[in-house]
């Protein structure tokens, strides 16, 4: 079954993976804005929530109501599970819980790795060595001067290594130079768990008429820490979801017609062609099960 959180609601729909029809609903009995779901056992999962809580649910019938509402100091959006632990990134650091002891009193914090308004939409990722990765913006005063990918050892609950992609300070950048970050960045990892993908703003051209930019996908090799340009995303300034398919194609969630609550899934192929799929509601996430 698929478990889908509904934005600005107090419920989770249980979806049949073949018919895509709802086969059940988990309805909250108190305030909540469910966001992301991670399994902690064959029968239970934890749901992140904007209401500064984690919610434990049943993933087998009878689904019923949530099993537990767990208050935490700060809200968490994206979660990952490694080594019977849950990691969740907040503005105050990464929270760490044991899956058999999820409580405000039992939380540990990795304080040096934290998100901000424009990185809170980045998924935490797990590589082939079962290490946890997170993206942060590096600042000098009010200026973002680099994008840092931080690797966390889940056993030690400490930063193992980090790699930074600097943002150009050139007065006259050249085409292809990284010149900025984007609003609400996103991350993904390839099926081999070797490459981490994220988004930047690059210089498209620098002429007498001025500098033009384009949103671009960069990727980093988890073994070498080397960064490389992957694909440009012309026509995109901000997105609601981002994923790279097993074939290496980029899929974005875009929303243009706010009044009618309609949006698009955009597929950027490696040959430069683009496919667009109009969908019925605001799309916010793309997954490849």
Residue ranges and their predicted role:
Residues 1, 42-43, 83-84, 129-130, ...:
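Short coil/turn segments that connect the beta-strands within blades of beta-propeller domains
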Residues 10-14, 53-57, 93-98, 141-150, ...:
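Structural motif
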Residues 16-20, 59-63, 98-103, 153-157, ...:
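Short loop/turn segments that connect beta-strands within beta-propeller blades
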Residues 21-42:
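Blade-loop segments of beta-propeller domains
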Residues 163-261:
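Intrinsically disordered, low-complexity segments enriched in Gly and acidic/Ser/Thr residues
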